Regions:
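Intrinsically disordered or low-complexity boundary/linker segments at protein termini
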Residues: 1-74, 85-91, 95-160
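Repeated scaffold domains used in trafficking and secretory/extracellular systems
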Residues: 76-80
């Protein structure tokens, strides 16, 4: 990074479709939440409708200064980058080829960052993944009321 983290005024967090289905998503999201809470920095989340709804529900339990935007086309990511100012930083949720949230456009991210973000702050997050049987056992469905309550309780305990 070319500038101190304390000078960042806003983080742009871009999430791929189905990011909320990754077994390590909530753990990774916790890292972003901690950045927002500890720095007081505004966070702008960009993701598809389902993923944004999951994050909005969590925000109701543990509030941070955040805005949410529906974003479905990773080919249009440059539009988000064009909104960024000098004191903004990027947090990009990524996925490996075997992960459910993987998008082919992710293969172009390193080159794009090298060409256009060389002197800007950015963070690439790869949520941890489990083998398929373990993933199925650990996966939570935010649409399931019991799972939602459990996720909310876990997040609430973490932030106490």
């Amino acid at each position: 990074a070319s500038q101190p983290v304390s000078t960042i005024q806003r983080y742009f967090v871009i999430l791929p479709k189905k990011a909320h289905l990754e077994s390590g998503f909530f753990h990774s999201l916790l890292k972003v939440w901690n950045i927002a809470r500890n720095s007081g920095t505004k966070i702008e989340f960009y993701g598809n409708e389902k993923t944004i709804k999951v994050i909005e529900k969590i925000r109701k339990k543990v509030n941070i200064d955040a805005s949410f935007y529906i974003f479905n086309d990773w080919n249009e990511m440059k539009r988000i980058f064009e909104k960024m100012k000098e004191n903004d930083a990027l947090i990009l949720f990524m996925a490996n080829r075997e992960m459910v949230s993987f998008l082919p456009q992710m293969q172009e991210v390193p080159k794009y960052l090298n060409d256009h973000f060389r002197y800007r702050n950015y963070l690439l997050i790869f949520p941890s993944r489990k083998t398929k049987p373990e993933h199925e056992k650990l996966a939570r469905d935010i649409g399931n009321a019991d799972d939602f309550v459990e996720i909310g309780n876990i997040v609430g305990k973490i932030f106490k």
